Amino acid sequence: MKQFGMILMFWGVIMNAQNRKTPKDSITLVDKVEVKGSKKKMETDMKMSVSVDEFLASSDKISFIKRGAYAWEPLLNNMSTERSVVTIDGMRIFGACTDKMDPVTSYLESNTLSSIDIKSGQEGSSHGATIAGSIDLKRKSTPFSLEKKWNGTYQTGFEFNNKQFFNLGNISYSGKKLVVDGSISFRKAGNYDDGNNKEVNHSQYNKFNTGIGIAYKTSPLSSVRIDAIFDMAKNVGFPALPMDLWLSRAMITSASYRQLFKESLIRSWDTKIYYNTIEHYMDDTKRPENLVHMDMPGWSTTYGLVSSVSLKKEKYTSAIELNMYNNTSIAEMRMYPQDRKNRTMFAYSWPWVTTRFAGISMNNNWEISDKSRLSFGVSLGLNYNESKYVEFNWIFHPGAPQQKTRILPGLHAGYQFTENNFSFSVGTGYGHRAPSVSEGYGYYIYNSFDRYDYIGNPDLKNEISYETNAGAGFKNGKMSIEAKVNYFYIQDYIIGKILSLGSPMNYQSVGVKAYTSLDHATLFNMALNAGYSILPELHWKGTLTYARGRDDKGKNLPFIRPLSYLTSLHFTHQNFGVQTSVNGDFIQRNYSPEYGEDQTPAYAIWNFSVNYTFNIKKLKTVFQVGAENLLNTYYSTYADWGNIPRMGRNIYTSLKFNF
């Protein structure tokens, strides 16, 4: 009944809204989640101490697999990270954990972001071959200034449920020739309690992140910039896994050159070279119940080049991008009874796999008229893999080649039309992706969700995606409503199937699965977003999403989000703000027992926060207090690994200074 009431409220506000004419707007097929310099959106729409994961979750295209309170795995269009491209300022970065406990999003903090650019399907193929799309995390970059300026923020706070203490700081200097951006952050959290006030063991984490960027103007139309990020996480627990993270370190560096042009077909040229290295050490020494201990260290090193040119001629614009990178991924398994000196087993779960990629893409926009726009693009990539220790692959795939080269094409096209306050869009796409390192070369990678060891297959075919999308919307000065749908038909869909040969290596495993290709799979996603200005100071927003995924036998795919909703009210008056929201999922009816899922019940969560803005001398100060899961509901979702319960009631406070 709670969920039914929420839907009635959702539609009731829409149906009673009054239309007022305002200048026309348009729907684009690209979602951009903006974080302005003052972060006004963050201060009013959600808690100020929001993480990158929590901020990404505000997009209707993003959901998460959660194995604990830290480093959630982002799912774009309900597809796992193998099918999407996640970058930082266009740079390719690959995690070093076979269990996906270090997604790219875990190597930044929210105080370093300026925006997050989310592109769906083949529109996201600029930075590499993809099926689901791309997520580009854009870091802050202060522009040059005619006058010397110093700006900064400092934010601190405390969350009571898991006793999390955090500090976030930013500082920037800008002048005519020189810009310097700096950031630092630290978070320390203990175990959290669920809705039954029971402690969830192994859910603690510690995270430190810092970064610097220096830009220098070499001429009125050109500049150079160097950037560096250092991220370290220690003592991170994962309650859904049989082991935890002892240490993770990442160093991400880049140097770039930007050239602008006056009154020319070429408007700008940007070139960047980059290098990043990640080390990730998992072990189970804090799990005394494990009969045999295991260390799982991993290393990932990537260097690459991104070069893009922007063109404009009257109503035509184009972006051409060259993308090249080289990655080496290594992961080990080391078993021992109690003493590391008495090692009983060693194996490479990633046997020194090198991936080299070179691709070029072209994305075009043509303003046909004031009411219509055509977008189209093409990409072509060359993907090369090599396994140094190919004998691990020969155990299950005798004679498999040590090297593999694949051609990865992509196409997309879309049309947008606006008339008065209405807007419409349609689009289509076609693209290939290569198997990931785990899918192609993984060796006995334990999946604690279905309790199988997974084996890669170097001879897997490319996944091939055929997609369609459409959207329709209405917007005036008082209300807005937008509906979006997309459909993916994925040929040679890669997934794990039970292998009759071989026995499990992990004593917790129930068997062995090998990655194989289904004939096809289908995915459908729908999102409905609406907003209504009840009063100048009072605004309502609502979102309704639905997805369905099936394999070639008509069976359900795993980790597909059930019908879900979010409804929120935001009140602001002078320096005072109040926000409240209810979000939840309906019962998960289309779950997949074959892939380890069980049915998760419906739930509804109520959140509430209050913030006040004031000045301390020349410092703009914001104080916020709020509560998540105010009713202390006990629940877990379809995407909680092993049905680990979510956090119960969490009271939080935050104080932010701007200067």
Whereabouts are the PLM-identified features?
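Transmembrane beta-barrel wall of Gram-negative outer-membrane proteins
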Residues: 162-188, 198-234, 245-267, 309-313, ...
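Short acidic/polar hinge/loop motifs at secondary-structure boundaries
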Residues: 92-121
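Flexible loop and strand-edge segments within Gram-negative outer membrane beta-barrel domains
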Residues: 20-21, 189-190, 201-203, 207, ...
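N-terminal periplasmic accessory domains that precede
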Residues: 21, 45-56, 72-75, 87, ...
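Conserved C-terminal beta-signal and adjacent last beta-strands/turns
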Residues: 208, 215-218, 416, 422-423, ...
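Gram-negative outer-membrane beta-barrel transporters
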Residues: 367-374, 382-383, 486-490, 506-590
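Outer-membrane beta-barrel translocator/receptor signature
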Residues: 111-115, 124-196, 203-210
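Outer membrane beta-barrel strand-and-loop segments of large Gram-negative receptors
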Residues: 211, 296-308, 349, 353, ...
